[in-house]
């Protein structure tokens, strides 16, 4: 009986990935995002990543594999996940949770940097606020979204959307694949 559940879960994950692959624009946007990131690094820029919940963990994972390593040894790339607990608790307390990413970007973000956002709904107010600050500062925006892109649709320089309207975990599974592909492409572009 559990084998049927396991198989159904894996088949659903496959279906979501196939729907993502069916849209050629998604593949082009991954290439565009990798170029944007590599160009930023080559010009002394950095990437600042953010997300909420599981997407927050993915934002940290992305930054960690850029500053640490992915598969092979190579120079570290400048990446910061906006995840400092003292910053989040201070800004959350003093300004509200909707300001946690925007406030960090105000202090640390510079023209030529890239804001890398993850939101399965595309409606996270704290990320929308960060995008607004990024645009005002000349910071490029890459957004990994799901469903119909939500309020983030059309706001990013590059949006990579997983067109799934079910549970968020299926969207996150594709997001982590995108993250790994981006790192692989960045390494090739930086070599």
UniProtKB/Swiss-Prot annotation:
Cofactor binding, per record: Binds 1 zinc ion per subunit.
Q: Output the Pfam families linked to this UniProt entry.
A: SIS_2 (PF13580)
Question: Any keyword Flavoprotein?
Answer: no
EC number annotated for this UniProt entry = 5.3.1.28
What catalytic reaction does the record list?
2 D-sedoheptulose 7-phosphate = D-glycero-alpha-D-manno-heptose 7-phosphate + D-glycero-beta-D-manno-heptose 7-phosphate
Cofactors: Zn(2+)
Cell location: Cytoplasm
Q: Which SUPFAM superfamilies match?
A: SIS domain (SSF53697)
Instruction: Give the binding site residues for substrate.
Output: 52-54, 65, 93-94, 119-121, 124, 172
Name the keywords, alphabetized: Carbohydrate metabolism, Cytoplasm, Isomerase, Metal-binding, Zinc
Coiled coil start-end: none
Q: Which GO terms describe its cellular component?
A: cytoplasm
Its UniProt pathway annotation is: Carbohydrate biosynthesis; D-glycero-D-manno-heptose 7-phosphate biosynthesis; D-glycero-alpha-D-manno-heptose 7-phosphate and D-glycero-beta-D-manno-heptose 7-phosphate from sedoheptulose 7-phosphate: step 1/1
Q: Where does this chain mainly localize?
A: cytoplasm
Indicate the segments forming the SIS domain, all copies: 37-191
Which cysteines does the record link by disulfide bonds? none
Binding residue positions for Zn(2+): 61, 65, 172, 180
Instruction: Outline what the protein does.
Output: Catalyzes the isomerization of sedoheptulose 7-phosphate in D-glycero-D-manno-heptose 7-phosphate.
Report quaternary structure and partners: Homotetramer.
Note, other: The reaction produces a racemic mixture of D-glycero-alpha-D-manno-heptose 7-phosphate and D-glycero-beta-D-manno-heptose 7-phosphate.
- NCBIfam families cross-referenced by the UniProt entry: gmhA, PRK00414.1
Q: Kindly provide the name given to this protein in its UniProt entry.
A: Phosphoheptose isomerase
Organism of provenance: Psychromonas ingrahamii (strain DSM 17664 / CCUG 51855 / 37)
Q: What does the record give as the organism's lineage?
A: Bacteria, Pseudomonadati, Pseudomonadota, Gammaproteobacteria, Alteromonadales
């Amino acid at each position: 009986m559990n084998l049927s559940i396991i198989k159904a879960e894996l088949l659903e994950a496959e279906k979501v990935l196939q729907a993502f692959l069916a849209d050629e624009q998604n593949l082009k946007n991954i290439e565009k995002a990798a170029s944007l990131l590599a160009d930023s690094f080559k010009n002394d820029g950095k990437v600042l990543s953010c997300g909420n919940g599981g997407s927050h963990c993915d934002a940290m994972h992305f930054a960690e594999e850029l500053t640490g390593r992915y598969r092979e040894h190579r120079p570290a790339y400048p990446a910061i996940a906006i995840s400092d607990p003292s910053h989040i608790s201070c800004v959350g307390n003093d300004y509200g949770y909707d300001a946690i990413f925007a406030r960090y970007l105000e202090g640390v973000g510079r023209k030529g940097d890239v804001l890398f956002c993850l939101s399965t709904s595309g409606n996270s107010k704290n990320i929308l606020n960060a995008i607004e600050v990024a645009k005002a500062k000349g910071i490029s925006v890459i957004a990994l979204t799901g469903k119909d892109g939500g309020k983030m649709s059309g706001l990013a320089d590059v949006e990579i959307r997983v067109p799934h309207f079910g549970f968020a975990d299926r969207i996150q599974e594709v997001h982590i694949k995108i993250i790994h592909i981006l790192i692989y492409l960045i390494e090739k572009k930086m070599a």
